Amino acid sequence: MIVWSVANQKGGVGKTTSTVTLAGLLSQKGHRVLMVDTDPHASLTTYLGYDSDTVSSSLFDLFQLKTFTRDTVKPLILETELEGMDIIPAHMSLATLDRVMGNRSGMGLILKRALQAVSQDYDYVLIDCPPILGVMMVNALAASDRILIPVQTEFLAMKGLERMIRTLTIMQKS
């Protein structure tokens, strides 16, 4: 299983669109793809036809788990109408995660451990990241094998790219 994060510390640069497009291309090639929506705005969740206010489970629930096994993680994954593509949806409660979780030990590795529990079920995981550095972004980057940084050729998007590269450098050192 290969894990990609689609990340930039700037909103509106095409992270969600890139995630869906890449997932679609991979599934057309016969790969099993899990998408993870880590943004409280839940654009990916909505794009895939779910109402983030009424989903039966969300990424927030994953952060409440005490153990990460296939049996505990798989129920949080929803099937999409698109063949070969599933999602762990977002919910607005993700916006409170930094405050709720505090400084718990191992906070940055929760998503990585959860994805390892379902690694036999998917060929690729695509993580649609929020535009801010916080618990969700750190978890996404720590879980990733590769990072795709969409950027537009305009000043603020380039500043977002600079911040993203600084963040990656800091994480790589720690």
Where are these regions (language model features)?
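P-loop NTP-binding core
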Residues: 1-174
